[in-house]
Amino acid sequence: MTTGFKEILLINAQKAGFLLSEEIVQKFELYYKELIDWNAKISLTTITEPADAAIKHFLDSILLLHYIPLTGGLIDIGTGAGFPGIPLKIMKPELSVVLVEAVRKKANFLKQIIRLLKLDGIEVYNGRIETLDRHASFDYAVSRAFSEFGMFCRLAEPFIKSGGSLLAMKGSEAKEHTAAHEMTDHGLVCTAIHSYELPMQKGNRSLIIMQKCFT
């Protein structure tokens, strides 16, 4: 099942400008293998084939680094199987990460990955974002598949520092782009919308960046 994953990831990451170290590649491989093993028992993802997983999960996650230099603290809301939070942590070990996942079995998987990969400075919050301590504060909030765009902005905004950013990883839906320009009432300003195509014709993506106004 995992045959070809490493080669596909390495080739396409290099084409995208990422030279992955052997340590990073080993961690991505372990992550993928564990994902496949757990997915046979609990529903984590429908994206399991090597090429699909390499591009749609791992490369898609780290492509975010092309558009914003992540530093400080990141909260990944509705992380599911850990994308993009865990790949970003692997790429940037100095990043402090909180993964928010309401489903207990998925949260247990995330904790296992953190132990397996020996990652420090990353934790799992097993619960809904609405129940997280409002004193928690981050430089970035990211979501790849959480709810609809407006809901993500409303729920994530209280946890972002002034001047911090919300990063919505979406498909190419025009309605999401339009909605991005209508969030000023929530103290957010759209600073950029990046649209791009994944390699191997694996789909189109948009990254919507919303900055929280300074208060």
Where are these regions (language model features)?
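Flexible, active-site-adjacent loop/turn segments at secondary-structure boundaries
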Residues: 18, 42-45, 51-52, 81, ...
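Conserved beta-strand/loop positions that form the S-adenosyl-L-methionine
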Residues: 77-79
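Short, flexible micro-motifs
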Residues: 46, 81-88, 167, 174
